Amino acid sequence: MPHPALPWLIDVQGRTLAYDLYDIETWRRFGWSVFDPRVADRAAARHGGGETGRSYVAMLREYLAKHLRHGRRFIESLAVPAPGAEPPLMVFGGDCELTLARIVVEAIDGRFVGRERVEDIARPVPGVDYEASMFEPGDLVVTRASLLGRRTLNVSAPRAEIEALRIANSVFLCEEHRHLTGNPSFQDNLLHALLSVDPV
């Protein structure tokens, strides 16, 4: 999931929407996940219906809220410098695949629907480059900017305070996320870094 300070949601006009992904109220407002009435009704029915089913859905919603809070704290903790000497950080990733960085939300029949693929946008606005707005180079799971702990693809842009992740070395391959560890170049670079007596 993206850093809480990064834009992750756009409308069909291509404009950034300022909603907090880690705030349970965002999920409630858009009717996503266990806040989608169809999902909630199905979950309640599968768990006894009535008061028992409603209690189960309430528990799922609290579970989601708890994990969103934990996710926010985890991501924010990465920006806090560790006391003392930190080991050098080396990151590996792919950057040859267009990777989802932002989703488009559109209102369909009174519901807010999140779109992760350009072809799923029901009412695209002419002139909006959805591919450029939604996708960035990555490995189909993690964008290059995210792996580097950056808010932008522009590596010459000065780092903001939220970009405190200090990386000693980065290696990018033309590989999908799920195949990275099987890539011979990945293995070679990792072994070199782990076994080298020289600092990274």
Feature-to-residue mapping (PLM):
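Helical cap/lid subdomain of alpha/beta-hydrolase-fold lipid enzymes
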Residues: M1-V200
